[in-house]
C-alpha cells in the first residue's frame, strides 16, 4: 500500500529529481508528509555536509588513519552500549553519543599510552589499538548479539529503515559541527597545518584536538544508522581528499568537499529508486553513495593528472 501512494513509485532517475524538487518548491515537503525517499535525501544531505566540515580538517591534519581507526573502534563502544542497556535494536541518541565519545577518547588515550610507555612508533601503537578494539567488537557482535540485527545495522547501516525521528539527530550534529567550526575556524586551521606554530600563538592545541575528536565521534554517531559505522569513513574523508586535489584555500576545500558530498547524497537515493523501478533490483543506498564518492575521486584524480600532463607538454 505504501508503494501505491508514494509519488516516487516507478519513477526513473531524472523523474526522481522532478518529483522531489516539485514537492520541495510547492510546499508539499512537510514533516508529516515525508516518504522514505524524502527522508533518505534529507538525512544523507545533513550527513554529507556535517562530515565534510570535520573531514576537511582531518585531511589537512593528516588524521585520515586516526579517523579510520576511530570509525572501526567506535563499534566497540556502540556494542558495549547495546549490551549494558539491554537494547540490542534501538539505542537513544544520548547513549550512542556517550558511547562514541568514550570510545574515541579511549582510542586516543590508548595510542598515546602505548607510544609513550613502550616507546614504539605511533603507527605501531595505532595498529595495535585498532586490532585490539575492533576484534573485540566483532567478537561481541558474533557471540553476544547473534540473534539480533544490530551487527549488520551498526556495520553497514540500513537507509531503508530511516524514519522521521532520524532527521533531528543528524541536523543536531550538523548544527554542532557548524557552530564549533565557526567559533574555532582559525584555530582549527592553525592546528591542522602546524601545531608548534599554533602553540606559539597561545592556542590550546590539546583543547582543539579534543574538539576535533568530539566532532568526529558525533559525526560518526549521526551517520551510523544511515550508512553504518564503517561506511561513514567514506563520507568523512573522500570528499575532503577530492577537494584537496582542486582547491587552493581551506575555504575552497571545504566548499568543494560539501559539493561532492551533497552530490553523492542526492544521486544515491535517486539511483537506488530508479534501479528498483526499472530493473526490479534493490541496492543499498548507502553503498551506492560510497561508490559514487569513489567514482568522483577517481574522476577528479584522472582529470588533475591529465591537466598536469598537458601543462608539462605545453611547457616542453
UniProtKB/Swiss-Prot annotation:
Highest taxon above the source species: Bacteria
Membrane topology of the entry: Multi-pass membrane protein
Major localization class: membrane
SUPFAM superfamilies (UniProt xref): ABC transporter involved in vitamin B12 uptake, BtuC
Keyword hit for GTP-binding: no
Keywords (A to Z) from UniProt: Cell inner membrane, Cell membrane, Membrane, Transmembrane, Transmembrane helix, Transport
Gene3D superfamilies recorded: ABC transporter involved in vitamin B12 uptake, BtuC
Transmembrane portions of the chain: 1-21, 39-59, 64-84, 94-114, 124-144, 171-191, 196-216, 226-246, 252-272, 286-306
Biological process, per Gene Ontology: response to zinc ion; transmembrane transport
Entry GO terms, CC: ATP-binding cassette (ABC) transporter complex
InterPro entries: ABC_BtuC-like, ABC_TroCD
Location within or outside the cell: Cell inner membrane
Keyword Transport: yes
Family classification: Belongs to the ABC-3 integral membrane protein family.
Function, in words: Part of an ATP-driven transport system TC_0338/TC_0339/TC_0341/TC_0342 for a metal.
Name of protein: Probable metal transport system membrane protein TC_0342
Organism the protein comes from: Chlamydia muridarum (strain MoPn / Nigg)
